[in-house]
């Protein structure tokens, strides 16, 4: 894949974006936060929009330039989405810089940003969030092979008698045998949404989106039920 194409391709179509800003501690909305959006695929990386959040912690929905719709519907095309950086700041919170937000044509992207409260000092802190290129566009290492039949260990925990949709999914941020990697608790709904956003494009036909999300849910629930 030739990533140099991204700096030269045209942006004839339009997608939309709304940013929601919350406190990481209690998920309360943060009003009057400043949101700056920059296009990463132009030479000057100029500011595309500067917005403020309302009393609900939301910006207005804005229009942003994107590549042609056909790119996301045709395999092996140029980058099918516009890449934007989002910087969010608010008094009393660390500034958050999100790099690589992906905006597709003809669909609305909703980006949640959770700001970290400052520790009570005047020190200026920031946190960086990098979004990797989409799995359908970039090249990634193949999935680690797994044994078709696995040994079931006696953990002493209760074994589910039927498939249950969990409230949270535990995400292991590392290789399966890396005990030093951290685990994160993610709500089931957010986990499915995040996986779907990484595996398919929102511009696909509705039937294709349904089929892929059902496959993602089936795989996830199988992992939970079998404790793999």
Where are the regions a protein language model picked out?
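Beta-strand-rich domain onsets/edges
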Residues: 1-30, 45, 51
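Beta-strand-rich interaction surfaces with strong enrichment in secreted/lumenal proteins
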Residues: 7, 48-51, 73-76, 99-102
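Conserved, single-site charged/polar hotspot
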Residues: 8, 32, 52, 64, ...
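Solvent-exposed, conformationally flexible loop/turn segments
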Residues: 11-12, 104-108
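Hydrophobic beta-strand segments
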Residues: 33-40, 86
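Short, acidic Ser/Thr/Gly-rich low-complexity loop/linker segments typical of extracellular
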Residues: 42-72
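A short, solvent-exposed loop/turn motif at the edges and junctions
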Residues: 71-99
């Amino acid at each position: 894949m030739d990533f140099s194409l991204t700096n030269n391709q045209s942006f004839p179509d339009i997608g939309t974006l709304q940013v929601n800003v919350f406190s990481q501690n209690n998920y309360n909305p943060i009003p009057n936060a400043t949101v700056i959006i920059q296009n990463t695929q132009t030479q000057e990386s100029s500011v595309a929009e500067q917005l403020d959040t309302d009393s609900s912690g939301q910006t207005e929905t804005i229009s942003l330039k994107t590549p042609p719709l056909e790119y996301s519907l045709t395999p092996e095309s140029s980058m099918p989405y516009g890449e934007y950086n989002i910087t969010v700041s608010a008094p009393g919170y660390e500034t958050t810089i999100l790099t690589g937000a992906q905006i597709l044509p003809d669909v609305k992207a909703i980006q949640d940003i959770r700001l970290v409260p400052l520790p009570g000092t005047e020190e200026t802190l920031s946190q960086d969030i990098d979004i990797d290129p989409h799995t359908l566009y970039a090249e990634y290492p193949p999935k680690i092979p797994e044994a078709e039949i696995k040994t079931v260990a006696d953990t002493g925990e209760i074994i589910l008698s039927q498939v249950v949709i969990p409230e949270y999914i535990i995400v292991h941020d590392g290789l399966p045998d890396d005990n030093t990697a951290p685990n994160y608790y993610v709500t089931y709904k957010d986990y499915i949404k995040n996986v779907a956003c990484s595996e398919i494009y929102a511009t696909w036909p509705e039937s294709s989106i349904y089929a892929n999300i059902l496959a993602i849910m089936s795989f996830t629930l199988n992992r939970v039920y079998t404790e793999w």
